[in-house]
Structure formats: structure tokens, C-alpha cells
Amino acid sequence: MAKAKFERNKPHVNVGTIGHVDHGKTTLTAAIATICAKTYGGEAKDYSQIDSAPEEKARGITINTSHVEYDSPTRHYAHVDCPGHADYVKNMITGAAQMDGAILVCAATDGPMPQTREHILLSRQVGVPYIIVFLNKCDLVDDEELLELVEMEVRELLSTYDFPGDDTPVIRGSALAALNGEAGPYGEESVLALVAALDSYIPEPERAIDKAFLMPIEDVFSISGRGTVVTGRVEAGIIKVGEEVEIVGIKDTVKTTVTGVEMFRKLLDEGRAGENCGILLRGTKREEVQRGQVLAKPGTIKPHTKFDAEVYVLSKEEGGRHTPFLNGYRPQFYFRTTDVTGAIQLKEGVEMVMPGDNVEMSVELIHPIAMDPGLRFAIREGGRTVGAGVVAKVTA
């Protein structure tokens, strides 16, 4: 059978494996890549290639991550797998590898364990929208009732963190049996069933260009006779000459009209997601706009000063603080293009936060910033990064 030619026109979806240590995340990753390559074309990767995860830097934080790609009949998947629990925490909080959906691997021999719970909570906090469960090592459990029990426990755990536990697909199998090419329901069939569940349960993600227009402002210039130009990289959507935009954040929201879009000194009709543009604003004075604000489609994003966040605090080795911080700590929060001072409130019963910890906190900023849940930020002290976080919930 001739291998299908790789086509770039399949929709691209980002996924990853999560779950407790030694429950089989990396073995499953290898099994999916191998079986998809064999069945649908593409390149197989073996366990050792995935397990020797290379180091990467995201926002100055060292993270070990493996990236694997595979095809299903209708999609192209990019899959991340991390070797250690700390890598998952950092990866999910920094958004180094954004996931459109996660595969929760839970060993049927153990049932849900502490990191199973923690990864589900992290997924909820950082906004992973969908979870699919792979109940692994089912070939080592003789008792059907025990499998039912473990499946029920996992579903209840998902429901605890506001995932639809009752409707979540749960695939039973054995990653090792599948990787070894064994037939039967727990072998290769289980991995093909998992891929089919990815295809049907995770909706195709909305592309940046189809979202509402948003551009973080990096710089502001005054051009005599023409007005004020703001520059930045368009994060989402499309902006056309003549459209209205809002300037959001730091000060009161102002509405204005785009009178020109330029790129590399050339005038354009529109600016699109991913492009660096200069945008000319009608009747806006140079001092009314500043770095750290955003240009947005009117009504799509609001400025906020209070939010709950999930934060990873850099360890000493990563260049972070050497000492813990306490309630009321006031660092700078770096959103998109600027620093804003904020005060933190730790959860009840949490006295202090040690370097290397991840923690939930509430933050109150001294200026409002345009934000939605899922927005990433860095925590800085005098220009050096000491933490990374993600907005879990906006509160005021």
C-alpha cells in the first residue's frame, strides 16, 4: 500500500498527554505515533526518542518537552509529552505548549493518584478545554468490576473540576501492548479508538485570524500632518481601514477609527493576525495612548484590576528568588508589553510561597489591564523574571 502524501491542508490540532508519573504517558505517546504512522502515514518515533526530551526555554524557564506529530484520517496532530511533573506544571502555566485538548493517562492498576488530580486541576486553571481519558494497563487487571470502578473514579474526579465527567470519552487499553503491535481490544485497536475519540470529541480550534481583532500596543509615534500611529503585532483577527477600534487598558477605554494600516512603510487595506503593523488612529493624541494598552474590536475585551491566577515561581537555579515571599508581596506583573505593579493575596492557610512552587493566588493591580481568562503573564522584580502565571478567573 502506497503511503499517503503528507498534505498541509488538514486542520492542525494541539494535544498532549497528562497524568501521574509512571502511568504510561510516554509509552502511549510512542504507541500513538507508531500506530498512526503505520495506519495513516507519517513518521514513527520510538520510546527512547520521546523519553529523551530536549530542554527548552519559555519565558526564561527551562522546560523539558517532547514534541511528536501524527496524522489521523482527517487531522494533523502536534502532541507534547513531558518527562517530569515539574515540566508539566511549567509547560501548562507558561503556555509554552498550548493544548486544544489533553489525553489523561490513568493506570487501571493504580486508579487516580495525586498527580492525576493535580493535572486535572491545572487543566481547569489554565483553560485546557477538553480532556479524553486513556485507561492504561487494562491487560494487567483481571476483574472487569475493578475497571468499572477505576473508570467511575476518574469520571467523578473530572466532574469535581467542572469537566463533563459523565460525557468524557474513556478508552480502555494497554499502551505497551499497542506499541508492541499486539492485536485485540487492548492492543492497537485501543489506540485507534483513542485517535478516533480525539477526532470526534475535540472540536477544531478557532484560528487566530477568525477571532476578534486584538493588537497589543508596543510603541506610539506622532506623524505630523497625519496623526498618531501605534505599532505592534496583531495577535488575533483582521483590522481594515475605516473600522472602529477601542483602546483598552491602563486608562479609560476610548473608541476611535483606523485611518491607515501600514507594514514596512507600505500602506495596506488591512492588517492580519501574526503581522507587525503600524495603525493610524483618527483624532487620537500621542499622549492618550501608551505601550501596554491594546487595540481591540469594540466590546470584545474589558480592562480589569483583580483576578485569580495559577502561578509557577522560579527556583533559585532558574534565576528566580532565593527566598520565599509572603502575603501582600508587591512585584510587577508583565502583561503582553508592559509591567504593572500588583499585590498578591494567597489562599487561606497558605503562609508563604517557596521558589520552585506552583500556587493559586489572587492579584490586585494598580492599573487595569485588558484581560480574559487564559492570558499569560510574567512576575518580575526589577526587570528579572521570578514567576510565570496565567489568569484563571477575572474577579473585578
Curated annotation (Swiss-Prot):
Q: Name one GO cellular component term.
A: cytosol
What residue spans carry the region label G1?
Answer: 19-26
Which regions span the lipid bilayer?
Answer: none
Classification lineage = Bacteria, Pseudomonadati, Pseudomonadota, Gammaproteobacteria, Moraxellales
CDD domains per the record? EF_Tu, EFTU_II, EFTU_III
| Keywords in alphabetical order | Cytoplasm, Elongation factor, GTP-binding, Hydrolase, Magnesium, Metal-binding, Nucleotide-binding, Protein biosynthesis
Which region ranges are annotated with the description G5? 174-176
- E.C. numbers: 3.6.5.3
Provide the residue positions that the database annotates as binding Mg(2+): T26
Which HAMAP family does the record match to this protein? Answer: EF_Tu_B
NCBIfam families (alphabetical): EF-Tu, PRK00049.1, PRK12735.1, PRK12736.1, small_GTP
> What is catalysed by this protein?
GTP + H2O = GDP + phosphate + H(+)
Would you identify the family this protein belongs to, as annotated?
A: Belongs to the TRAFAC class translation factor GTPase superfamily. Classic translation factor GTPase family. EF-Tu/EF-1A subfamily.
Entry protein name? Elongation factor Tu
